[in-house]
Amino acid sequence: MGREPFNLKNLEMRIINNKKDAIQELKRISSRTNSENNNKINLIVEEILQEVKTYGDIAVEKYTKKFDGFNPDPMQISEDHLKDAWDEIDSNLKRSLEVAHKRIKKFHEKEIPQSFTIKGEHGDTVQRRWRPVKNAGIYIPGGRAAYPSTVLMNAIPAKVAGVEEIIMVSPGNKEGEINKTVLAAAHLSGIKKVFRIGGAQAIGALAFGTNQINKVDVITGPGNIYVTTAKKLIYGSTGIDSLAGPSEILVIADETAQSTHIASDLLAQAEHDPLASSILLTTSKNQAKEVLEELYKKIDDHPRKEICMQSIKNWGLIVICENYELCIELSNNFAPEHLEILALDSKKILEGIENAGAIFLGKWTPEAVGDYLAGPNHTLPTSGNSRFSGSLGVETFMKNTSIIEFNEESLKVNSLDIINLAESEGLHSHANSVKIRFED
């Protein structure tokens, strides 16, 4: 028992067939971003944020030149340019964006939290009132790929929530240009303000405000380690959605699942990033070997071969499990961002799942469906955070307020209990604030 060393040509991927080793390996993968460099990155980001806070646009331009290699002047992309981008993209792509927009909007409209009022028997009322934040900033990554889907997934719930002003930031390429499809998605989503800046300096601009960029109440959207660190450091004075780590998928499968489907779905994560993680929990030893073979075939001529190889080699894993119960236990411990269930009794497995950002059931539901147009948000908790949090949604862009109104009768009826509780905490002025209202 223990590890079976597998080395298929240049592809290395761990196969484990016992619970103890599986738990240790999943723990290692989950903590893959806990680097010794984190303190160094914190210091760099703190300096950037402080400069942006002090010098505003000048600091933003400085760091954009330094890290992105272009002068972002002018910083804002005009609304006409956004409209031009929409007009210029392929008609088929335009249709696909519209289909995705419609489905995502329909789902998020169901998420709108409802205000409510409870009336007490003595005339008191208590209310929960929901209101949108005034403005929000959304960060759209550049770099290895363009993500128009991320524009939709961040902008649509903000729009549905009723946010008055949405400011989008995204790093330009060396020529200072943002991908045309990303700009088209911004136009479709009704975004008026787009700035071609990225990195920690963009987060600082949104958090503190500059002459050109208004300070926002909430910042959402994924980014690299510098963006994530900046969001962590400004949290408390500005709201954020989450601290996104590298993408991850966990597939639970049995012998009925097709190995070529599994391999394709694992690679769909691996191609994102060298730190992306692709994990298979299977009840079939033969399937484990077949999936490895399929991975090699598909990676060999993949346009992002090197990224896939690094991801699979360092953060890929196959675990051969005795039964569904072990698959469920290991999955819940790992708490994946994306969970696919490709098994004959997928609904039974689903009943045991407690921790997952999003769950994809059956052979006709590859994770890519959720990435683009199923409707639920694709901004999901990573690094085990689905144990206590969920996806980005309409509530991310809203806040609630409690409204309380007592009359003389309701305060009198409840006064003794309020006084008793206040005095038990030694807060006598609290108690007196009730007593004094009934003194002659």
From Swiss-Prot:
InterPro entries linked to this entry: Ald_DH/histidinol_DH, Histidinol_DH_CS, Histidinol_DH_monofunct, Hstdl_DH
Cofactor comment text: Binds 1 zinc ion per subunit.
Residues the entry annotates as binding substrate: 247, 269, 272, 338, 371, 425, 430
SUPFAM superfamilies: ALDH-like
Reaction equations catalysed: L-histidinol + 2 NAD(+) + H2O = L-histidine + 2 NADH + 3 H(+)
UniProt KW Cell inner membrane keyword: no
Entry's EC annotation: 1.1.1.23
Residues bound to NAD(+): 139, 201, 224
Pathway: Amino-acid biosynthesis; L-histidine biosynthesis; L-histidine from 5-phospho-alpha-D-ribose 1-diphosphate: step 9/9
PROSITE patterns linked: HISOL_DEHYDROGENASE (PS00611)
Residues holding Zn(2+): 269, 272, 371, 430
Molecular functions (GO terms): histidinol dehydrogenase activity; NAD binding; zinc ion binding
CDD domains, alphabetized: Histidinol_dh
HAMAP family: HisD
PANTHER family per the UniProt record, alphabetical: HISTIDINE BIOSYNTHESIS TRIFUNCTIONAL PROTEIN, HISTIDINOL DEHYDROGENASE HDH
Job description of the protein: Catalyzes the sequential NAD-dependent oxidations of L-histidinol to L-histidinaldehyde and then to L-histidine.
Protein known as: Histidinol dehydrogenase
Lineage start: Bacteria, Bacillati, Cyanobacteriota, Cyanophyceae, Synechococcales
